Design a protein with these regions (language model features):
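Structural core of flavin- and non-heme-iron oxidoreductases
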Residues: 1-209
């Protein structure tokens, strides 16, 4: 529910290890494009909410806003406590500089006061599209490769297991996008032969070099 981004140096590290063009600067416009920020009210600001408008979007599908807040001495006390332990105040943790403490926004539709999630933002508004098919209760087993050469490896499909246990392959017309989270994305790659051979070898009969 908390809406926070990584440090800019963490994202820039992806380019440094070989993913050309993957930087904080190049990714920021897509962060902004995805957002629909509800600007904090004067009451929320008085209670400690703060943000940098230059790093937010207000026309995207995902609602982001601040929880209901009432002015009190809570943030003053909290700030004093953190300052005494060497933790500085930062205006906004979503600028690429996370070090410090801050009253950060949440993935929330403030107008309806409900939690915002991927279904509300990206699925429900588009579920009637003819070119969108969602497979429920389906597990992705591994990627199917067009070539097994590490330098030219291109995924052309995904092997899946459906709810009834049937194993089949979904073929891609253009590209395969892995979006399984910070834990499952690397796990799926390892099951597909991509990663440290020490871990990949026991998991996959195909190892890409």
């Amino acid at each position: 529910m908390a809406y926070t981004r990584a440090e800019d140096v963490q994202i820039d590290a992806w380019e440094q290890i070989g993913n050309e063009g993957w930087t904080w600067k190049s990714l920021l416009p897509y962060y902004e494009k995805s957002q629909n920020l509800t600007v904090p009210t004067t009451v929320q600001v008085a209670a400690g909410a703060s943000y940098d408008s230059s790093v937010y979007g207000e026309e995207g599908p995902q609602h982001v806003g601040f929880l209901k807040m009432e002015p009190s001495n809570f943030t003053t006390t909290l700030n004093r406590t953190f300052q005494n332990t060497g933790v500085p105040w930062t205006e906004d943790v979503n600028t690429g500089k996370m070090r410090g403490w801050n009253i950060f926004p949440s993935t929330i539709n403030y107008a309806e006061y409900v939690r915002e999630d991927a279904a509300r933002a990206y699925y429900w508004p588009y579920q009637s599209r003819k070119n969108l098919h969602v497979l429920m209760n389906t597990n992705a087993n591994r990627l199917i490769w067009k070539s097994q050469s590490g330098d030219e490896a291109t995924a052309e499909g995904v092997e899946i297991t459906s709810a009834n246990g049937t194993v089949s392959t979904v073929h891609a017309k253009n590209e395969v996008i892995i979006s399984a989270g910070a834990l499952k994305s690397p796990a799926l790659l390892e099951l597909s032969g991509v990663g440290n051979p020490r871990y990949v070898h026991p998991l996959s009969s195909i190892i890409l070099h």
